[in-house]
Amino acid sequence: MTLWVVKIGTSLLRGETATTIDGYARCFAGAMDRGDQVVLVTSGAVGLGCQKLALTNRPDTVVALQAAAAIGQGALMGLYERAMARHGRSVAQVLLTRSDLADRRRYQNASGTLRQLLSWGVLPVINENDALSPAELRFGDNDTLSALVAAAVEAQQLILLTDVDRLYSSDPRVDANAEPISDIRHPRELDSLEQGAGDGGRWGTGGMTTKLAAARIATASGITVQLADGRDPARLEALLQGQRGGTVFHPHPEPLGNRRSWLAHVLRPEGELQLDAGACAALQHRGASLLLVGVTAVRGDFAANQPIQLLDPDGEDLGRGLCSMDSDQLRAAMNDPSPGESSPVVVHRDGLVLRSR
């Protein structure tokens, strides 16, 4: 049994949306009939709302986008519900915000709810709660959301469907020398690609940049990611039957566990700690906890047990951790002229996750 998370982008849900969704539904039902489980993360609520309002351009204000999403979400779910019903399957709408996943208990509740739906043979249809989410609580794109959902349910496979056939070394629409890429085997290979990735289209929010970020999140959690052309549902059917297609992002050989994945990718840092070289070496090579003596600078205001970003001496991202002190306590301890015999723990190794190198 394979647990699949499939993300369908806005660019695939234009025009004859009902016909397109019918094709995807056949693929999902076929996989479920074979004993697999499928979670769908779908875009399209804003685009469908704009179609219903006969808008020629995507709204450019948050309020208008949220209103369009409110109109389109019900219609979108209706299309999926009717399409899956033709195959004797039910769907369940799950709308999420970042705050739903940032709280550890709610994160576990969301994971448990999705697992229960899957055990009943239901297709969970997930979207961001666009109609209500303020900017600071938004994922911003469904590529990221799909990777976080895949990690939460401990999926084996994440499929990112888009309107290009695979990843390229540069944008093939403007660069005739762009080279197709079939495999990405290490996070380092993503670095240069992320720098050259483009923005989203007129209707969507996720360009190739967000897909690469999603692949980084999922592969760090031990999930295989496939980026493929979803314009023909037959290609999705082939992927769900185990065939390769598009670009395959291979999982990290030492994946994060569920809690560390949550810490690394769901929580937003409330501040920064810059470390000296000795502390960096202790964290990276000896699996140590971060001690106060290794902290050279504190930035931001945060409470105890909130997530903070760790930076090396050059200001490069080292990882994230849950800080045992609030920012005022930490600054006071650093400035204490008579520290105790032992340096206190600032971030325990159990609440620490380092960036993949």
UniProtKB/Swiss-Prot annotation:
InterPro entries: AceGlu_kinase-like_sf, Asp/Glu/Uridylate_kinase, G5K_ProB, Glu/AcGlu_kinase, Glu_5kinase, Glu_5kinase/COase_Synthase, Glutamate_5-kinase_CS, PUA. Its EC number is 2.7.2.11. Keywords: Amino-acid biosynthesis, ATP-binding, Cytoplasm, Kinase, Nucleotide-binding, Proline biosynthesis, Transferase. CDD domains: AAK_G5K_ProB, PUA_G5K. Substrate binds at S43, D130, N142. The gene is proB. Belongs to the glutamate 5-kinase family. Pathway: Amino-acid biosynthesis; L-proline biosynthesis; L-glutamate 5-semialdehyde from L-glutamate: step 1/2. It comes from Synechococcus sp. (strain CC9605). This is Glutamate 5-kinase. Residues 270-353 form the PUA domain.
